[in-house]
């Protein structure tokens, strides 16, 4: 397993709230919590930037992390990430923040310590572009947006 340096920015982590951990052996994501001073509401149509109390330093340029929504928040409450996905580059060392957007028509309450997003580590491939006049022919060619059919 790859080791990633994590800096605890909020002393409640490890005392009042656990470090992010994988829920099962098959879990891809680690839950991130709202580490605010008090509970708050996100009004309909509003976006808020929420601290998680953590910083990570991935260091390995072949890895990055993405902050993704928790499926239940979007499906049950209409609350999603304000930037859809957050990308954490391997050389970033600042605090992890979560942008939450309430796209529902009701206020959404966030309690201190609520799990609000998940962090997933992913491999990185940096591409080198090769300029060509034409691509090698494939069966699909330029077909997109529904090209492969519905059934």
From Swiss-Prot:
<keyword id="KW-0460">Magnesium</keyword>
<dbReference type="InterPro" id="IPR036157">
    <property type="entry name" value="dUTPase-like_sf"/>
</dbReference>
<feature type="binding site">
    <location>
        <position position="83"/>
    </location>
    <ligand>
        <name>substrate</name>
    </ligand>
</feature>
<comment type="function">
    <text>This enzyme is involved in nucleotide metabolism: it produces dUMP, the immediate precursor of thymidine nucleotides and it decreases the intracellular concentration of dUTP so that uracil cannot be incorporated into DNA.</text>
</comment>
<keyword id="KW-0546">Nucleotide metabolism</keyword>
<dbReference type="GO" id="GO:0000287">
    <property type="term" value="F:magnesium ion binding"/>
</dbReference>
<feature type="binding site">
    <location>
        <begin position="87"/>
        <end position="89"/>
    </location>
    <ligand>
        <name>substrate</name>
    </ligand>
</feature>
<feature type="binding site">
    <location>
        <position position="97"/>
    </location>
    <ligand>
        <name>substrate</name>
    </ligand>
</feature>
<dbReference type="GO" id="GO:0004170">
    <property type="term" value="F:dUTP diphosphatase activity"/>
</dbReference>
<dbReference type="InterPro" id="IPR008181">
    <property type="entry name" value="dUTPase"/>
</dbReference>
<keyword id="KW-0378">Hydrolase</keyword>
<dbReference type="GO" id="GO:0006226">
    <property type="term" value="P:dUMP biosynthetic process"/>
</dbReference>
<comment type="similarity">
    <text>Belongs to the dUTPase family.</text>
</comment>
<dbReference type="InterPro" id="IPR033704">
    <property type="entry name" value="dUTPase_trimeric"/>
</dbReference>
<dbReference type="InterPro" id="IPR029054">
    <property type="entry name" value="dUTPase-like"/>
</dbReference>
<dbReference type="GO" id="GO:0046081">
    <property type="term" value="P:dUTP catabolic process"/>
</dbReference>
<keyword id="KW-0479">Metal-binding</keyword>
<feature type="binding site">
    <location>
        <begin position="70"/>
        <end position="72"/>
    </location>
    <ligand>
        <name>substrate</name>
    </ligand>
</feature>
<dbReference type="Pfam" id="PF00692">
    <property type="entry name" value="dUTPase"/>
</dbReference>
<comment type="pathway">
    <text>Pyrimidine metabolism; dUMP biosynthesis; dUMP from dCTP (dUTP route): step 2/2.</text>
</comment>
<protein>
    <recommendedName>
        <fullName>Deoxyuridine 5'-triphosphate nucleotidohydrolase</fullName>
        <ecNumber>3.6.1.23</ecNumber>
    </recommendedName>
</protein>
């Amino acid at each position: 397993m790859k080791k990633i340096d994590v800096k605890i920015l909020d002393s409640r982590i490890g005392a009042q709230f656990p470090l992010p951990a994988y829920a099962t052996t098959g879990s891809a994501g680690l839950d991130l919590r709202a580490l605010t001073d008090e509970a708050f509401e996100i009004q309909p149509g509003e976006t808020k930037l929420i601290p998680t109390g953590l910083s990570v330093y991935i260091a390995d340029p072949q890895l990055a992390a993405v902050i993704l929504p928790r499926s239940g928040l979007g499906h049950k409450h209409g609350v999603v990430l304000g930037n859809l996905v957050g990308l954490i580059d391997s050389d970033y060392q600042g605090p992890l923040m979560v942008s939450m957007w309430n796209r529902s028509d009701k206020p959404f309450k966030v309690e201190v310590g609520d799990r609000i997003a998940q962090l997933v580590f992913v491999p990185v491939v940096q591409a080198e572009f090769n300029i060509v006049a034409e691509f090698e022919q494939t069966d699909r060619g330029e077909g997109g947006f529904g090209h492969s059919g519905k059934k």
